[in-house]
Amino acid sequence: MVTMIAPSASMTIHPVRTSGTIIAAPQTYQYFERLQERIVRFVTKHSNITRERFLALMMDTQDLASDVGSVLYGEEAVACGLVGRLGGLSDALEALYELIEEKKKKSE
């Protein structure tokens, strides 16, 4: 699998949240916890970032003003293993065409 991010792109990693009114019950908290766990499992399964590092970025209180989470820019996302490599649109298209050719060769 190929994952790519533009050098000038940014991504925000933060805990699951909602806007608006919610019912303040233990079940609501458990629902958010389960939803967040599914996201963490998906991201760590499909990238090279460890669960511990991803959670640390998600819960960081030093990066965002008056909020929890982290902002990563292109090179940082690659360095921590969240994204495979840097690239722009032409790089992504080239990778796509390579994957198509590989699939064609396998089916022959």
Regions found by a protein language model. Give the residues of each.
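N-terminal organellar transit peptides
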Residues: M1-E108
